[in-house]
Amino acid sequence: MSGISRRKFLTCTLIGAGVTALSLKTTDAFASPKLEGYPDSMGVLVDLGRCIGCRSCEAACNREQKLPEPAQSFDDKSVFDQTFHSNGQKRRTDEKAYTVVNRYEPAGQEKPVYRKSQCNHCNEPACLTSCFVNAYTKTKEGAVIYNPKICVGCRNCMIACPFNMPAYSYSSAFNPVVKKCIFCYDTRLKNGLPPACVDICPQEVMTFGHRKGLIEIAHERIKANPERYIDHLYGEDEVGGTSWMYLAPAPFEEVGFDTTMNNEPIISNVKDFLGTVPMVLAIWPALFTGFHLLATRKQDIEHHGDDHPAHKEEDKKS
């Protein structure tokens, strides 16, 4: 029997039927339990007033995560003049760049303000909540990490993220991979080391430490230099709080931040949204799970051949 076996097909069908039944009753089955973060987690305080736009952090991230070489070198400052779409949208992260620096020119400022963007590693991640296969994990260190072996490519996380950070790799339609900053978890964070971008910064724009301590440092800076900072720490409370937090010398809305977010975690809004589309929820997971199984079997066959003993045994059972 070629393609997906009947056993796998029936399994997918049963999963789809179960999802349909559950989705018509409640949305709780598709949401992870409420997660309030870890009190002793690590974080990063970003002081935008110190950034000079050198892009060293972009280069360090590229090396640490073994990402493709960029089309323009990291020394090329012309990227700051690039905009996308008719609304003048700045550069954003994608599957080839987990962090980007953009330049802003807020009113009343003598010099530009540079802002580094990456996943903010929410205390209560909406990407985790929206993922029905639990491909996301919030670690005790504070990182929100992703398991590509579990992901089925539904892209719910991209819709749910309030910061629009998860990026999708479109290189293969049947091999779903979401790309984003992982806080250098595998190579640095879990070993107690700061992320590569923090380590490389020549201006000490970023401070790595326990989140609670960083909040104290931030408010001390604001109190000591009220003329230098806006009296707000972005990320302390927004959407339930984030591991990456920001100080700014100009209004946050003028340097690319969404200031319309409230302090309620997106997790509750995700549940409300999922509750409005039960039939979509019923079809979407089963559809993408089926695609994922087809793709992985195809790759396995290409690697081992259709006569591989495992395939023959599976077909006998089906």
Regions found by a protein language model. Give the residues of each.
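C-terminal segment of N-terminal export signals and the immediately downstream linker at the start
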Residues: 24-60, 295-318
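Short, conserved phosphate-binding/catalytic loop or strand-edge motifs used
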Residues: 175-179
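Right-handed parallel beta-helix
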Residues: 107-126
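N-terminal secretory signal peptides and thylakoid transit peptides that target proteins
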Residues: 1-17
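Sec-dependent signal peptide hydrophobic core
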Residues: 13-18, 278, 282
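Aromatic- and Gly/Pro-rich amphipathic surface segment
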Residues: 80-106
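Long, compositionally biased charged/polar accessory segments in the mid-to-C-terminal portions
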Residues: 207-305
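Iron-sulfur cluster-binding cysteine motifs and their immediate structural context
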Residues: 29-34, 56-75, 98-102, 124-152, ...
